[in-house]
Amino acid sequence: MKHKLMTSTIASLMFVAGAAVAADPTPVSVSGGTIHFEGKLVYAACAVSTKSADQTVTLGQYRTASFTAIGDTTAQVPFSIVLNDCDPKVAATAAVAFSGQADNTNTNLLAVSSADNSTTATGVGIEILDNTSSPLKPDGATFSAKQALVEGTNTLRFTARYKATAAATPGQANADATFIMKYE
């Protein structure tokens, strides 16, 4: 009987102690991380869509045998820059210039690199063309053909492709370019 009473008492005390801990009203705060907020206010005719500001254009995979001569190109891959909240009373047209590391052999092309320590392809660069199929030198000063702005949303269309500068060797062929807008 004593044993049952002792077991019952211990079980009751554990339950009460557990309930006391669970009901602790003292809040606990811990560091959860950092959230970065980025944005920009612009005094311009339009605002660049957030989806257009940072995008990836997948050019695809090609055999080195596709490049048999200097100037050979791959298929053009379309991409666009979307402008929101445009007011054609502020500016009637928009144009884009791209900036990036130029290829050493052909400065009209972006130089390719590898994203990690992988082998980088050689003998090719990336060519950017505007909606009139005019190549855009990645110098930050060669602007695309002007596009007339309409009220609201406007889409500026471009293409990109690989272009041979020499005999191609296999490897990753990536590049980054920034762009600036010109409103007139």
Curated annotation (Swiss-Prot):
Belongs to the fimbrial protein family. Residues 1-22 form the signal peptide. One of its GO terms (cellular component) is pilus. Its main location: other. It is found in: Fimbrium. Keywords: Disulfide bond, Fimbrium, Signal. This is Type-1 fimbrial protein, A chain. Disulfide bonds join 46-86. NCBIfam families: PRK15194.1 (NF011741). InterPro entries: Adhesion_dom_fimbrial (IPR000259), Adhesion_dom_fimbrial_sf (IPR036937), Adhesion_dom_sf (IPR008966), Bact_Fimbrial_Adh_Pro (IPR050263). Coiled coil: none annotated. The keyword Glycosyltransferase does not apply. GO terms for biological process: cell adhesion involved in single-species biofilm formation. Fimbriae (also called pili), polar filaments radiating from the surface of the bacterium to a length of 0.5-1.5 micrometers and numbering 100-300 per cell, enable bacteria to colonize the epithelium of specific host organs. The keyword Signal applies. Pfam families: Fimbrial.
